[in-house]
């Protein structure tokens, strides 16, 4: 891979465009691709291409390391040496690749490039985009199995955690409200607010084939305590169990 300063020369009138590249071959291909699409960063080179067609040849002016200060200095030297701003196709001094910012048709170029990308993505479709750009798991260069941990229920959790929020044990001292009690006023407010609503963490329960929305419903039906319902669910003697638990 060669880097440095190059020129694109019109073989009909000898006018040139001076540029810099980290890889000459790749940069030249990009130039002609943009010219064919009509969205080149140099409006003067684009107009000449539109008028004369592909009568251009590329050549290396100077091979140098691709370092910003050095590249800008030598590119500006060749722009002045070949007079390519006044009698050529350069529209600005060297900018280390940023030629779009000073382009008179900047907005039009951005719009064309945006439309091209959108059309490409639309043509690929969801499956095509996933196959082409998705890099899950070990295919991703930043993937590290040590930073991925899963709870027994299958939910991804932080590496410092032992369980997900849903599976976490909140009984006894594990409960932040342990040894605390609500006041009668607070209990009354909570009761009024929760009337007609069912808790989000309720589980359906099967009691000998009869399905109930929650343990409380089963307790009311059999006229027993919720604690006894829980006991029978955990006991091997009873055909009681939570559904999808």
From Swiss-Prot:
A GO term for molecular function: sequence-specific DNA binding
Cofactor: Mg(2+)
All residue ranges annotated as the GIY-YIG domain in the record: 1-88
UniProt keywords, alphabetically: Endonuclease, Hydrolase, Intron homing, Magnesium, Nuclease
UniProt-listed GO biological process terms: intron homing; negative regulation of DNA-templated transcription; nucleic acid metabolic process
EC main group: hydrolase
SMART domains hit by this protein: GIYc, IENR2
Function field: This endonuclease is specific to the thymidylate synthase (td) gene splice junction and is involved in intron homing.
Name listed for the protein in its UniProt record: Intron-associated endonuclease 1
Gene: ITEVIR
